[in-house]
Amino acid sequence: MRSHGQHISDRLTVEVDCHSLSSSECPSMTSGFSPLDSPTPTPTSLYSQGSMASPGWHDHPHYHHGVPMERRTSATPLRSAFRMADLTSSETMMGMPCGTMDRQEQMPLPDYLPGYDENVDQLWIPQDMPKTYHEHQFPYQASMPQYNQMARNYYHRPQQAGYLPESASNPCLSRPIFTQPTERMPNSASMSNMLHWMPSHESLVPQTITPAQVQPFPSGPVTPPSSSYSDFPTNIPTFKSHTPSTPHRSVSMGTPSGSDTPVSRMSGHNDYQEDFQLSPVYREGMMQRHRQPSRKSSKKQLLRSNLSLENLPSIIKQVQFKCKEPGCKGRFKRQEHLKRHMKSHSKEKPHVCWVPGCHRAFSRSDNLNAHYTKTHSKRGGRNRYVATLDETSQDFDPDFRGQLTPDGRPIYGSKLEDTMPDCGELSVDGWDD
């Protein structure tokens, strides 16, 4: 036991009102109790720096008779291992009632002693306890800022600056749709024009809404009264009955007559075009989208119009050469293109196919060459196959002009003017000889 000359800050003073106990059962200031004799480590921030020894509880045999204390051992430093147990009687501690104290009026010890942890058992102290230093009570550090008188587990949100209620931004939370006057606010009115009649944030107090004030949405078609809404649109779609996931609220924010209601938003697409002015380009695009039936049909019509020679740009019309054939509207940019086109109108076809049995004539040489490639160079067609015109054949010779065998092979040494022998009398071998 240390001497009683220690500094007053090295001792933990516990005052207990012992009017119903004898002097032998009540521990007091003269019992020599000191927290420095406790075997359980306690936070050093609770005591002064006068001693580096671990404080401990006084192991007195009848200390637990007056106010029952529960002692626990723990190896974790800076943790509280004691608590006040069974504070259910009407006895007073330090002159304050503890047993009749409500749970919300109790404040955990970590709010007074920063060395304690919230996870350990807490020593509850009344919240009304003055947070000033007294020499004969718990010494502690500087006082902490006062909290609001509310439950400790209440989530306190600081009051914001001026704000608008939810019903101001959500039209579905305004008054019922058929209780407003008939006239509407002009569409040009903005939120800045409505701020002068809106109440300030000091006058916006929370309101409790009773279930009787809640008016649910109608389950059937909405039929407005003829006396209230004479200009109500007649093409409003029927509302579908539904069950909302959240309860409906009807909040009154003191909107004056002429305020915009959800009914004024029901007239459809035209009202939104009035409220939000569309750009000319966007409006024209929307009109074209409604006029055009489909993209495919519009593309076909565009291609047909482009194929017409009358729809050519004027810059090309100035330099083109027009066909002089009656009834022909052909125009060309170059002279040689016009000459080639004029041959299609002439009856002269100097280019004739040389293949025996064909004798097809063309007015242009390129058309004749295309005829050779597409008609006589392929097997299995109804036209005669010519091996000299097939690039894949070993007899390929585009300059050959002469007689051909029945299978299309050339007869070298023959001429086109020669008569072909009868196929029944001569064989292919005889032709080769």
Curated annotation (Swiss-Prot):
Expression induction: Expression is positively regulated by pcz1.
GO annotation, cellular component aspect: chromatin; nucleus; transcription regulator complex
Skewed-composition ranges (Low complexity): 34-48
Keyword DNA damage: no
Subcellular compartments: Nucleus
Residue ranges covered by zinc fingers (C2H2-type): 321-345, 351-376
Pfam families reported for this sequence: zf-C2H2
Protein name: C2H2 type master regulator of conidiophore development brlA
Native source species: Penicillium roqueforti (strain FM164)
Protein's gene: brlA
